Amino acid sequence: MPENVTHVCSDTLGLTRSRVGTVVLTKHTRKYSQYFALLCKFLKDCPELCQDFPFTSISTNFDYAARTHRDSNNKGVSMTKSFGAFIGGQLRYWPDDDGEGELRALRKADSLTLDTKANLALFDGARAHCVLPFLGERYSLVYFTIEGHERAPKETLDKLRTCHVSLPVPASGAWKYYTQMLSPPKGARAKS
């Protein structure tokens, strides 16, 4: 969370891990399945995508300028888009972050700035990233895949499919396509 912020407006739709570690549909997905399906269809219908983007979950955010972090429980391959009447709020992303160093040691010169308001942005959520400060109202969607999604019950996975989710199959098809678009991180040592 940003400094001096006590809460953020953020929810996850799709799959999540329960407190005991099982993979389940979030309560908001069960309650608002048509809304979830609409967000899934939005991504599926994007003309910029060459292939259906594989994911299990969507993080929905309002006015959240995330500090530099690496996502936990995210297999990495992520797609994001932001909306609203705001200025700033780009995604800063370190494509060569290998997750080994401390976040405070990252150099701004090694990052990319992605305009998620103008375009969808593909990034690896397990690598360092943050949202730059903004003015106005900013909404964002982050499509990602949770670890262990394949252990979800069949009826849960079937429910996702009925909501237009293209489930990831790690060694084939779209998952391989998008993973290969993200070059392997070089790490901090490669920059020395």
Where do the protein language model's features map onto the residues?
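Fe(II)/2-oxoglutarate oxygenase catalytic core
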Residues: 1-122, 126-192
